[in-house]
Curated annotation (Swiss-Prot):
InterPro entries: Domain_X, Maturase_MatK, Maturase_MatK_N. One of its GO terms (biological process) is RNA splicing. It holds the Pfam family Intron_maturas2. This is Maturase K.
Length: 504
């Protein structure tokens, strides 16, 4: 029992984080501004403070929040406060900006301490989105079933605030956060309005949501490690691809006795868990009975331990050989590649049928064309159209934008098993560029191409980056070169999915 208590208890040193005094430090807000932690920064230009955050304003604001009878009480959030010259929404955003920076300090320090160890070289590659696909190639081809679960969103902000009680010890910071949420977000019901979230700092909401998700994942990993025949090794830190700073192997005050009677339900030595944003994926080699037990475990865990309503329909179970997993811009499935081997023993020869399982990654061409259609590069059928909003730009800028989008898509989808869909996307972008230029010069597409020649826009058909790299290694006439071109290539430098359009 002592062994489980050591595993379950939080590290005491991590709970001695008194964050409330940092709210009154002006350099916290300067740090948020200088490092660009929030794109929609708020500046206070009155009272002679200049374009900067002032700790004096923060002190006055917090003191004013504690008073029951405030000087100004307005039913309309758009009315300005004559004391500061800004509305109440700006106050909530100001507190959120500072608090978002402050609560991330303990995680940043812990991440720095881990980076000084020997595991940092192994963890760097986990920052790339593509790092998950080599793992899928190695593991998923041997598995049978996959469970997809949409993580339910907290229906009340109090759940998100309570998720921080394991990381932040002083109650003043939590009370201030709770008060600002209820005071300025105007939460009158258990269902959070979308408008209330939009006025609050999205970075802080993202941090609170990831803290809540990390808590239930820690319980899941604990049960998985205790039930598995082959204990998985818990790493000190796991770099989330985009949003979260770290995952720690310790979890909150959960008692082992509550779970030990149920561990026998989940015996499975081959089980893998992946989460990205709001989706969790659980893959198993065992029978459908076991994966169904995990399904009801997820639903019960969310409802009874985290008070989140989750319907069983949000958790789907599929067989990998008959289902394509829509994940991170790829349709992944397990494909059987049949092969026939001729064997001869003495004078007798016979044929042996052998099927090899491989991971097949394809581009979701329909959804990708839908994204291009929303960005006004083509219609819903995939026919290229002009981009009128870019027609006022210089020709070089128009070509550069289209070429950059084409190369970004080619770079990200370089791991596709079939490249024909990618060639169709390049075709759409190329002729959308031509139609945009023809629209600008008030000409037809045929006349415009005839005037500039066939060498125009050759950037769209130049060799890709991976082809250029391998051309420096292998001779052009080498036979293996063609196989290399058709192979999947995963890059470990992609840390985010680039938007199709960077400029409006």
């Amino acid at each position: 029992m002592e062994e489980f208590q050591v595993y379950l208890e939080l590290n005491r040193s991590r709970r001695h984080d008194f964050l409330y005094p940092l709210i009154f430090r002006e350099y916290i807000y300067a740090l948020a501004h200088e490092h660009g932690l929030n794109k929609s920064m708020i500046f206070f230009e009155n009272q002679g403070y200049g374009n900067k955050f002032s700790s004096l304003i923060v002190k006055r604001l917090i003191l004013r929040m504690d008073q029951q009878n405030r000087l100004i009480s307005s039913a309309n959030d758009s009315n300005q406060n004559p004391v500061f010259g800004h509305n109440n929404n700006l106050y909530s955003q100001m507190i959120a900006v500072g608090f978002a920076v402050i609560v991330e300090i303990p995680f940043s320090l812990r991440l720095i301490s881990y980076s000084q160890g020997a595991e940092v070289a192994k963890s760097h590659n986990l920052q790339s989105i593509h790092s998950i696909f080599p793992f899928l190639e190695d593991k998923f081809s041997h598995l049978n079933y996959v469970l997809e679960a949409l993580i339910p969103h907290p229906i009340h902000l109090e759940i998100l605030v309570q998720a921080l009680r394991y990381w932040v010890k002083d109650a003043s910071s939590l009370h201030l956060l709770r008060f600002s949420l209820y005071e300025y977000c105007n939460l009158k019901s258990f269902i959070t309005p979308k408008k209330s979230i939009s006025i609050f700092n999205p970075r802080l909401f993202l941090f609170l949501y990831n803290s809540h998700t990390c808590e239930y994942e820690s319980i899941f990993l604990f049960l998985r490690n205790q039930s598995s025949h082959l204990r998985s090794t818990s790493s000190g830190v796991f770099l989330e691809r985009i949003f979260f700073y770290g995952k720690i192997k310790y979890l909150g005050e959960v008692f082992y006795n509550d779970f030990q009677n149920n561990l026998w339900l989940f015996k499975d030595p081959f089980i893998h868990f992946i989460r990205y944003q709001g989706k969790s994926i659980l893959a198993s080699k065992d029978t459908s009975l076991l994966i169904n037990k995990w399904k009801y475990y997820f639903v019960d865990l969310w409802q009874y331990y985290f008070y989140l309503w989750s319907q069983s329909g949000r958790v789907r179970i599929n067989q990998l050989s008959k289902y394509s997993l829509d994940f991170l811009g790829y349709l992944s499935s397990v494909r059987l590649n049949p092969s026939v081997v001729r064997s001869q023993m003495l004078e007798n020869s016979f044929l042996i049928d052998n099927a090899v399982k491989t991971l097949d990654t394809r581009i979701p061409i329909i959804s990708l064309i839908g994204s291009l259609s929303k960005a006004k590069f083509c219609n819903t059928l995939g026919h290229p159209i002009s981009k009128p909003t870019w027609a006022d730009s210089p020709d070089s800028d128009i070509i550069d934008r289209f070429v950059r989008i084409s190369r970004n898509l080619s770079h990200y989808h370089s791991g596709s098993s079939k490249k024909k869909s990618l060639y169709r996307i390049k075709y759409i972008l190329r002729f959308s560029c031509v139609k945009t230029l023809a629209r600008k010069h008030k000409s037809t597409v045929r006349a415009f191409l005839k005037k500039l020649g066939s060498e125009f826009l050759e950037e769209f058909f130049t060799e890709t980056e991976e082809e250029h790299v391998f051309s420096l290694i292998f001779p052009r006439g080498f036979f293996a070169m063609r196989k290399v071109y058709r192979g999947r290539i995963w890059y470990l430098d992609i840390i985010c999915i680039n938007a199709l359009v960077n400029h409006s």
